[in-house]
Amino acid sequence: MAHITFDTKNIENFVADHELDEMQPLIKMADEQLRNRSGAGAEYSDWITLPTDYDKDEFARIQTAAQKIQSDSKVLVVIGIGGSYLGAKMAVDFLNPMFNNELADNQRQGVKIYFAGNSTSASYINDLVRVIGDQDFSVNVISKSGTTTEPSIAFRVFKQLLEKKYGAEAAKQRIYATTDANRGALHDEAKISGYETFTIPDGVGGRFSVLTAVGLLPIAASGADIEALMTGARDAQEEYSDSDIKNNEAYKYAAVRRILYDKGYTTELLINWEPTMQYLSEWWKQLMGESEGKNQKGIYPSSANFSTDLHSLGQYIQEGRRDLFETVVKLDNPVSNIDLPHEDGNNDGLQYLEGVTIDEVNTKASQGVTLAHVDGGVPNLAVHLPAQDAYSLGYLIYFFEIAVGASGYTFGINPFNQPGVEAYKTAMFALLGKPGYEEQTKVYRARLGK
């Protein structure tokens, strides 16, 4: 039995049983392309068996490195962007208290985790340098090539900060490079400088890399249980190995999404009801958007954080265009709970909630919102998590990964490349005057009137 539950009771008015039956041949074909490595982009599909086939020796080194970081640092600065950032950020937030970095050292499981290299904002970098201040820190720089603009800029800044604080040689012992095993600028620098290195596997694309060293080192340094994370993913790998939709809820999710898309529901909102899950949505958006958005096809991935966004997006969801559907990730058992405090009088009108916990309010709110949105014509799917722990997160990660792999093949596209991102990079490099872009520089500067 699956550890997480996929609930489709609120799409009965939108998707008929026979439509799911009719999707089965397409899902079976997609499954064969995934399992047999015969589909487009198959060279980047090693994530399918990663929970069982990962490098156990490197995993042990990750655990040792995390312990070293915890012993000599108060802060770990994780430098990366896209898949080299979102997976780790998502998991660190999900598996730790909301204000983890603000807790006293004896109340935290691991070090404070801050992220850099995920934007070109000078203010962000400067503010982070000020936050670190005199605290001991280490750096985990994550880049397959070592030449991605945003991480490379941040790495220069924090590497020099380390060297200024500890000296050039001691600084090298505080830099952990997660990069290509054999080539690239970061690989070469790490080899020359003697940084401890971890591998980004060739067969695992960035958005699928959270269960590699890309995600595991920051997650472990935060104090979370990466063994339980991998166990959850391993059990999900086994659970979602059947090509039959009736026996595979991840494939059922993929099938339902495709049916809704064909009916004009082209935007999917991932909904959470816990602030610590905000970056689950950000990670999911990259996973879905980069995998499916090709050849003028694909479901547009968006998200909302409830109940907060009900006070901004609630009106549109309820009565706006009927081209969206919701997938709610609902935590069934909160990490902690609070009873609503007693107060004499009833000035705030909350006396009727006397004896109710705040999570009960959260649950009833989510149920009420779902009913209202379904009544308003919004198909509503739900993924129920029994607990907010590492095992459940590993399970959920694999659920979404295998679902989007199959979903991509049902669209007839390559789910594992992202050719479209080169367009903006070409324009950016040309405007910055990067060598090799001289002709494009003339064109783009002329378009800007410069």
Curated annotation (Swiss-Prot):
Pathway: Carbohydrate biosynthesis; gluconeogenesis; Carbohydrate degradation; glycolysis; D-glyceraldehyde 3-phosphate and glycerone phosphate from D-glucose: step 2/4. It catalyses: alpha-D-glucose 6-phosphate = beta-D-fructose 6-phosphate. It is found in: Cytoplasm. Signal peptide: none annotated. The active site is at 290 (proton donor), 311, 425. Pfam families: PGI (PF00342). One of its GO terms (cellular component) is cytosol. The keyword Isomerase applies. Catalyzes the reversible isomerization of glucose-6-phosphate to fructose-6-phosphate. NCBIfam families: PRK14097.1. HAMAP family: G6P_isomerase. This is Glucose-6-phosphate isomerase. It comes from Leuconostoc mesenteroides subsp. mesenteroides (strain ATCC 8293 / DSM 20343 / BCRC 11652 / CCM 1803 / JCM 6124 / NCDO 523 / NBRC 100496 / NCIMB 8023 / NCTC 12954 / NRRL B-1118 / 37Y). The lineage of its organism: Bacteria, Bacillati, Bacillota, Bacilli, Lactobacillales.
